[in-house]
Amino acid sequence: MLFKKKVIMAVIMSVVASAVAVTVYFTWFKPSDFKPQWTDSFIQLPPPETLGTMSVEEAIQRRRSIRSYTSDPLSLQDVSQLLWAAQGITDSARNLRAAPSAGATYPLEVYIVVGNNSMTGLADGLYRYDPHGHRLEHVLKGDLRSSLAEAALGQTWIKEAPINIIIAAVYERTTARYGERGIRYVHMEAGHAAQNLYLQATARGLGMVVVGAFHDDQIQELLRLPTDQKPLYIIPVGHPRS
């Protein structure tokens, strides 16, 4: 009798362990479960173009950090291409994105700060990029560039650029699987996304620079980021002045 009880308990524990493993697997590998957190106001972006006029080699050769921009507005297609290059879906069957991610945990959240009269077809404000719908979620109204620049130690190119792309991260999406080493993976992924942005901007005749010098708490408060999202990059983008 005691032996039978032990066998039954072993079977039960095996089933429970399998259920937990399956639950964890689908928690880690279903980035589509990350739902928008603020509003139902979405702006659909035009489909990204996958056949450009500049080769990867030429984009690498031409890539530079640009800090001076004209006042010419960006188009929705420009923003569509940039956000797709950073975090867009490139394999809808498996929810894979343009930038590689450790274990497909996808910790990054991407936003854009749009200035007044800085884009055709898009009002000033803060928007969150939804990769699965390839659309923008309107989060905040108003031109936040001056406040953003102030929180970034007064770097004027942030205020002068038509738009600023913000890359933030939810570390727990990756550290839940990889522990402390996941922090490194998150930072690597942010670099992958930023390099994609550089090359896409270059291919479209745009200029940008990555900024890492800012007060984290001020950026978090200004953009009203959820407490689990930490800002990693501010990236001003515009038409190069020269």
Mark where each language-model region is.
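Short, low-complexity patches enriched in S/T/P/G
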Residues: 1-9
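N-terminal amphipathic, basic helical "cap/leader" segment at the start of enzyme domains
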Residues: 9-13, 21-161
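Short, small-residue-rich loop/turn micro-motifs
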Residues: 49, 167-171, 239
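Small-aliphatic-rich amphipathic alpha-helix that forms the alpha element of a beta-alpha
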Residues: 63, 82, 110, 163-173, ...
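Conserved hydrophobic/aromatic beta-strand scaffold that supports enzyme active sites
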Residues: 126-128, 164, 234-236
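Short coil/turn connectors at secondary-structure junctions
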Residues: 160-162, 229-230
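A glycine-rich helix N-cap at a beta->alpha junction
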Residues: 224-242
